[in-house]
Amino acid sequence: NRIFEEKAVAEKLQQQTETEKNIHYRAVDESGKTAEQLVERYVSKGMPVIFWACINMREPKTGPVWKLKETGETFTWISNEHCMLLVGADEENYYFNDPYDGHGVIGYPKALVEDRHQAQHMQAVAVVKILENDCEKRKPGTETL
C-alpha cells in the first residue's frame, strides 16, 4: 500500500510552472527507477532529481497502520521516510543535497541508497526543460536532456 506523494509533488510543480510566464518545465514522475537509472538519465546531464529514501539512510520501520477513508484500503506507514535531491555519484557513493540536520551535500554508499529507496517505493520526480517550440503543446518526450 502506498500514497503517491511524488504525484502530488509532480502535479504542484507542473501547476506552478504553468502559472509563471517564460518558465517552460515539466515535472516527470520517475517512480520505479533506481538511483543508477536516475543518475544516467538526469543527474549526469546536470539535472538533479527529487528522491525519496530514509532519513540518514536509517532502517525503515513499519507502522502505524490505518484504513483510508475514501477507498477503505489499509495503509501502512513506512517510518524514517525522507526526501532529498539526488545530485551526483561516483564509483562508491550517491550524493544528495540534504538540508536535514545541516548535512548540505552528503554521500551514501550506493547499495545502501538503493535499498532505502526501495523501502520507500522508489519514489522520484524529475523537472525537465521543454523545448521552446513545444512549450504550448507540452507533449511528453519534448524535454531536453
Residue ranges and their predicted role:
Residues 44, 57-59, 63-78, 83-145:
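Noncatalytic regulatory segments and standalone regulatory/sensor domains
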Residues 1-48, 121-145:
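Cysteine-nucleophile protease catalytic domains, especially the papain-like/related folds used
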Residues 24-27, 49-53, 85, 95-97:
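Structural recognition of the beta-strand scaffold that forms the well-ordered cores
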